[in-house]
């Protein structure tokens, strides 16, 4: 079975890294104690007043993480260039806090410049969307959901990354909510008004949630994120390390409007083409939490990706919405790049669309959205 994004590490390496981290315990390096922890009572749902805000909600900051040689090997230099480029672009619009292992923090500061705050926190990898907390807003301000990151079902070393959510919440002094399921932030997309989109392949999966049914997981999602409607697409198991995250397929630009990553005309068929077709059918017939049908906007993938590898993520839908900006990938297909930028300008009026070359991330099977996690303003 081919696993993209990063090839699974050898078991010996995983064991060695995990063992070393286990000896470290949960020391917080002197960070202040968090405000506390919030339980998620069964059936609490939106009645408790907590909700997942949409990504366009104003941000306090963006969190990112610095890639490590342990995971990326000889490719780490190019990947770090991409991360620095994204961090600098986002920092033009809002504060960026980039987590880095202490010994690598000076190099991260040099690469990113003074406009990016580098925070020494142990990390394994760069995918902050998945390892970081997912923030929710409610009557008591803000809380962070810890989804118990487990390396996408144990596919990669994650001893440090499994503690990243707690470390961020401790540092921000934000209440932690321990989820009753295992998932990643990239597996959940919300419109900010009670509707979620998820892929079944990455959630109803024994490598994250053994013994839990789709109904069990849906109840947990509704309780955690204040949702009343969950739209499920099938996705694809075992074809990429995430088991197919929704944020590489479909995004809400606003309530009732879904941006759908669409294969280029005449693109060869594969497992992901079938997943797209199934998702499109679901979305065209779905209704949101308001009981309204969705408007599906196609965001065509590039037709020409040159000599890039088979696992390359050529997906414009993996963009990031910052304060006053949309940060999107650029792939070198001038027509597709231009069309995608124009579509996003129409969908996000008043925001600057910034397009960046991030081919090293793409070769790893991820993108800009995968590498970022927003901290929303509590208002």
Q: Residue spans of the language-model regions?
A:
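Short, conserved catalytic or interaction motifs in soluble domains
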Residues: 26
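N-terminal secretory signal peptides and thylakoid transit peptides that target proteins
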Residues: 1-16
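C-terminal motif of bacterial Sec signal peptides marking the signal peptidase cleavage site
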Residues: 22-23
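The feature marks the mature, well-folded catalytic cores of soluble enzymes
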Residues: 33-379
């Amino acid at each position: 079975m081919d696993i993209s994004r990063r090839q699974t590490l050898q078991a010996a390496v995983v064991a060695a890294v995990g063992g070393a981290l286990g000896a470290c315990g949960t020391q917080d390096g002197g960070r202040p104690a968090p405000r506390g922890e919030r339980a998620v009572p069964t059936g609490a749902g939106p009645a408790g007043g907590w909700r997942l805000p949409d990504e366009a909600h104003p941000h306090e900051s963006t969190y990112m993480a610095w890639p490590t040689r342990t995971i990326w090997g000889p490719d780490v230099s190019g990947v770090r260039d991409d991360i620095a480029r994204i961090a600098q672009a986002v920092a033009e619009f809002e504060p960026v806090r980039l987590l880095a292992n202490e010994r690598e923090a000076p190099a991260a500061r040099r690469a990113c410049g003074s406009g990016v705050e580098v925070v020494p926190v142990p990390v394994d990898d760069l995918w902050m969307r998945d390892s970081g907390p997912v923030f929710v807003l409610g009557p008591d301000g803000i809380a962070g959901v810890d989804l118990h990151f487990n390396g996408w079902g144990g596919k990669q070393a994650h001893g440090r990354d499994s503690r990243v959510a707690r470390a961020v919440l401790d540092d921000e002094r934000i209440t932690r909510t321990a989820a009753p399921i295992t998932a990643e932030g990239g597996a959940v997309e919300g419109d900010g008004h009670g509707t979620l989109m998820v892929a079944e392949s990455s959630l109803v999966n024994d490598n994250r949630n053994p013994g839990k049914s789709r109904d069990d997981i849906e109840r947990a999602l509704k309780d955690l994120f204040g949702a009343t409607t969950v739209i499920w697409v099938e996705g694809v198991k075992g074809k990429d390390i995430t088991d197919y995250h929704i944020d590489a397929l479909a995004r809400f630009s606003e309530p009732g409007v879904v941006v759908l990553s669409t294969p280029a005309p005449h693109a060869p068929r594969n497992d992901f083409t079938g997943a797209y077709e199934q998702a499109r059918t679901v979305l065209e017939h779905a209704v949101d939490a308001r009981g309204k049908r969705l408007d599906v906007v196609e965001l065509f993938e590039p037709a020409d990706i040159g000599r890039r590898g088979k696992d390359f993520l050529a997906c414009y839908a993996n963009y990031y919405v910052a304060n006053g900006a949309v940060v999107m990938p650029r792939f070198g297909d001038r027509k597709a790049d231009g069309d995608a930028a124009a579509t996003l300008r129409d969908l996000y009026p008043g925001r600057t669309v910034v397009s960046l070359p991030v081919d090293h991330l793409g070769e790893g099977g991820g993108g800009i959205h995968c590498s970022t996690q927003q901290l929303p303003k509590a208002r």
